[in-house]
């Protein structure tokens, strides 16, 4: 306890508390709980005094309001507590005589120059009201009362004597002290100022003392050694401790939140002077093109699968005169095309290996030999040319239409399915029957959703990439980007979406990067939305006839990088199914609990009593668009996939920071009247994360739209309330 007091209170407060105890012949070492209580009481008195001031005309100011006017201000409260007893009585009598009031029978803690009243301050572990009436019974009306409880309640005889900020400051400090004490198991040791049962002291016998010393955990020789260690341990760190000491100096003004206080987040996303956010997912999604080859559905090696697909589309395979459509800033288009031809030749040859020769253009593409050279710290200090790199702050971007388009296309139904889920045995219990029914509806919606095909492509590619990275660390390998789909007739097709080249992959740590060059087929002309593709070099490599129409085929090339963590997450991308399934089931369960029977079928298709459930799934021309339960489910699933595909530190930060704002909006909707402080600071934390992540920028755009609808809804409710009041 002694160590705790030293760490959490200023030296002057501790010394005054010890002097007070000495006047009553109490020993601080024998009564540490009493010393703590006096320190808390003193600090609360000083907090109240430091927060409130008067000018020459008697007008009150808080510490924040009085900034810049300090020369004309004086404290509103005189602190009597902490003075030597004889001096305190002399000060109390002088103040009473000076202001023409009666001297109280008991010594006060504070004197209020504005109301000309003495004040008693009380701190309690119990209910503030109970302690208030005990004090009231003793003191009568001779002085005002300010009672604060560790339970976060208070009781004042004069409510106007202390503003909201002052009350909040005192209660926050008490909460902090209680939390610190609880961490060190010292909370129950305290004896408050109120009358509570006191323990009985008794001396431990020799046998009990020995048993106590034997019972301590390994690493401690005796009980006293363990207690000393626990008293001195610092579980929360020096920052929190120093903040606790600074609490009287911190100025926080709570404010009741209104709808008008909320503004859109990330105003820069509407700035047309900024570039559109570019596409930066690892693989193409809605723009992908798969070269299909019918198969019996048997398992094949990736190289065999890719070879068969390329043989079927020989005009694309044998193309030697491409047309350059678009070039990324740092790309060498000649090197990229040579590397593509090497990949095709490696896949097409008769050898079983898919190893690539280490040519100069392959080394350029994979960044071989371009890694930083590590040198000793001592050498760096002596070398004047060595300096710390400036941190790379992401450039701000504006919202782009392609993100919404991707979302729309990925959540649509197609005629093919790639999702491969294991079969489940027959139902035994009634609960299993309900689960199977829900699974059937869920799988029917998700199976033919475009997003599930993209998800499986990511899973298969990252599995192959991680295997090759571990098995062939020093080699360049060609990895086909493949998938397998089944159409509505039950026919299986192998799909080749492109080829990738893996560089050297000596991945010692989980965050060590391996370079991956991707070559992907697409029928999308990049010139239609050039702002989407600055990271890609695009060639036109021929055309295909689809449904009697000729379509150009483009090769999208990109130099990229990944690490073990991202590859492992790619292998686990099926987890997107779980989250969307859980959200669907939560909705069905809620409906079922209201109706009293299983509502799975009713939500999807409707029944005799209920029509199919609908949800708001987007906006069109400023109005909300409704969609079926199945459509909402596909939208949720697609959002989960996008969250994985575009996941990075910006998205993590945005999700965490914006959650607070969402909670505030929910509190406003529930009419709970939330209070906030530093709202602009919260906005700043959110907007710091809105830079160049496409999903974050789109989420901010959607949030702003939703906030607009909620504000409009609140105005309607307010007008209804006014009519009802009239």
From Swiss-Prot:
Annotated localization: Host cytoplasm; Host nucleus
UniProt PTM: Phosphorylated on serines and threonines by host kinases, including human casein kinase II.
Free-text cofactor note: Binds 2 manganese ions per subunit.
Disulfide linkage: none
Motif (Nuclear localization signal 2 (NLS2)): 183-244
Biological process annotations from GO: cap snatching; DNA-templated transcription; symbiont-mediated suppression of host gene expression; symbiont-mediated suppression of host mRNA transcription via inhibition of RNA polymerase II activity; viral RNA genome replication; viral translational frameshifting
Cellular component, GO annotation: host cell cytoplasm; host cell nucleus
Broadest EC class assigned to this enzyme: hydrolase
Residues annotated as binding Mn(2+) 2: 81, 109
Keyword annotations: Cap snatching, Endonuclease, Eukaryotic host gene expression shutoff by virus, Eukaryotic host transcription shutoff by virus, Host cytoplasm, Host gene expression shutoff by virus, Host nucleus, Host-virus interaction, Hydrolase, Inhibition of host RNA polymerase II by virus, Manganese, Metal-binding, Nuclease, Phosphoprotein
Entry keyword annotation includes Nuclease: yes
Quaternary structure, from the entry: Influenza RNA polymerase is composed of three subunits: PB1, PB2 and PA. Interacts (via C-terminus) with PB1 (via N-terminus).
Entry's family note: Belongs to the influenza viruses PA family.
Name assigned to this protein: Polymerase acidic protein
Gene assigned in the entry: PA
